[in-house]
């Protein structure tokens, strides 16, 4: 009987100070359960088998058709220049299709501008073919080239229709039941360093391509063609706005800037690939130049065209990568519960953090009252 008070006192001393005032310790529940503290890859993915199959199939068909079109357009460089342009414009759509197939979300609607701009380029190439056929019917052999051109047009039309009919509502419904676990995840990081590096390389590549285009225009007036003027124009249009938008979005990311950057990159990427496809005939000329040894000095004009082609490909790849990075950030922000429609300020974010842990604030107050009572006793 005499040892019972000492046992109670010993047990009371072992109890933490902040836990003494709790009336019902068993009813305490932590804010985050171990099952909730999981990485995003452990969350049930918003996966669509139809989207995956469509993306892989469409990307494969576009790559194969574009490859055959580029080869045939380089075999007949003067007669099938429209085929090279159409094939080049479809390359970013193929890249985006494979990127979509690797994601666990339906991100096809976010590339709608890119698909529409590519479809506009292929339609223009089809009209170009019709005009050449009307002006000189005997010079054009309607054969496999028309089949490839129509196939590219149909593939892009199907992509545009599917992208227009796709939506992210199903994905949002699947993610709706996971809002509690998504709130504890960290905010989605914006790829600022990647976009800044892209913008620097884009400016350097654009200036180099502009200087190369000016030099190529002044090499020989007899060999200068309209393709150089068109390429020169699209370099000026595509390079600097995209680089400036990338740098500004990396400095202060917001919904408006990300959407503008996606739109600019989606518009300029197919156009740059179109110009690259048109200039791809310089590769065959360089190969023919090195067949005979020693190579002739006169075809140095083709070397400039090849360098211009490489810079255009670099610029087009950076624009496509920018669009993919921005869409990836946008989709990740939506799926992880971050606010995309409205930008939260610091006060709203702090209020949200306090609202997430009401039990902690309540327990601290009760514990402080318990400490005051014990000190008074």
Curated annotation (Swiss-Prot):
User: What segments bear the compositional bias annotation Basic and acidic residues?
Assistant: 1-23
Q: Which residues carry this modification: Phosphoserine?
A: 177, 179
Tissue expression pattern: Expressed in the brain, with highest levels found in the amygdala, nucleus caudatus, thalamus and hippocampus.
Q: Which GO terms describe its molecular function?
A: identical protein binding; protein-containing complex binding
Keyword hit for Transport? no
Q: Where in the cell is it found?
A: Membrane; Cell membrane; Cytoplasm, Perinuclear region; Endoplasmic reticulum
For the region Disordered, give the residue spans: 1-36
Q: What are the GO cellular component annotations?
A: apical plasma membrane; astrocyte end-foot; basolateral plasma membrane; caveola; cell-cell junction; cytoplasm; cytoplasmic vesicle; cytosol
Effect on the protein of changing residue 125 to R: In MLC1; accumulates in the cytoplasmic perinuclear region and endoplasmic reticulum; affects interaction with ATP1B1
Please tell me where this protein is predominantly located. membrane
- Transmembrane annotation, as ranges: 52-72, 82-100, 111-131, 144-164, 199-219, 230-250, 257-277, 304-324
Q: Which domain of life is it from?
A: Eukaryota
What does the protein in this record do? Transmembrane protein mainly expressed in brain astrocytes that may play a role in transport across the blood-brain and brain-cerebrospinal fluid barriers. Regulates the response of astrocytes to hypo-osmosis by promoting calcium influx. May function as regulatory protein of membrane protein complexes such as ion channels.
Q: How does it assemble?
A: Interacts with ATP1B1. Part of a complex containing ATP1B1, TRPV4, AQP4 and HEPACAM.
Pathological association:
Megalencephalic leukoencephalopathy with subcortical cysts 1: A syndrome of cerebral leukoencephalopathy and megalencephaly characterized by ataxia, spasticity, seizures, delay in motor development and mild intellectual disability. The brain appears swollen on magnetic resonance imaging, with diffuse white-matter abnormalities and the invariable presence of subcortical cysts in frontal and temporal lobes.
**PANTHER family the record matches:** MEMBRANE PROTEIN MLC1
Q: What is this protein called?
A: Membrane protein MLC1
- The organism encoding this protein is Homo sapiens (Human)
Q: Gene behind this chain? A: MLC1
